[in-house]
């Protein structure tokens, strides 16, 4: 049973992620969604006593458990009202968010995708999940879909794939996910951002890349674009804003534009991105 995992908290950010996950499940034939809630220390009230010890207020625990159960019910209803054929399960963990996710992925081998809600510059809800996006995406053994709070789901037809010109012939991971890109009317846009203004790309290299992509993706329309921007993330988002883009796919490892960026710049890029979900392959 193909499964999507959605970490949740008490914010509109993860609620939107749940809505998108259900739509994604419908478009790509997933059958099961697991909602994961972890305990966050900031959610508890503490009774402080002498000698450095502290105890959690029992009333706070009961209140949190009740709130959590209501949250599960609310989010499950959001999914099932629109897609009653989907199976919805809940999971609760007392470990950190990243560890909880990795543990449940190991326990549930049917999980193929993690959907993460992300605060953005248009809407910020102080989501716990959003604060941990980078660590989750980097340590997750399965692909992750980052969903901006402001994003409203639309059918995926125009897919942008930023890539390194020197690693573009290593796109095997993308070819392993053809179920995403083989849909009817899908168009692929490969984008190389160079950060040096005087950098030129040899014509033979362009031809080689073109032939390689067409060899492996003969049935899928695709175009390769070359652009200059000192800031890679800015270059990608600028391109996406001026060219109809429904999804950005980040390639794994050193062939990904993420590989060259610090955590801060990735976080800033995700924060600036309010229009497109980002799928990070593994």
Q: Where on the chain are the PLM-derived regions?
A:
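Charged helix-capping and loop-helix junction motifs
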Residues: 128-132, 204-209, 262-267
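Short secondary-structure boundary segments
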Residues: 118, 192, 251-253, 282
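Small/aliphatic-rich secondary-structure junction motif
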Residues: 1-56, 158-225, 245, 273
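A short acidic, glycine-rich active-site loop
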Residues: 55-70
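Residue-level recognition of beta-strand->loop/alpha-helix junctions
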Residues: 37, 92, 148, 192, ...
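Intrinsically disordered or low-complexity boundary/linker segments at protein termini
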Residues: 1-16, 107, 112-173, 272-282
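Structural beta-alpha unit
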Residues: 23, 40, 77-114, 217-248, ...
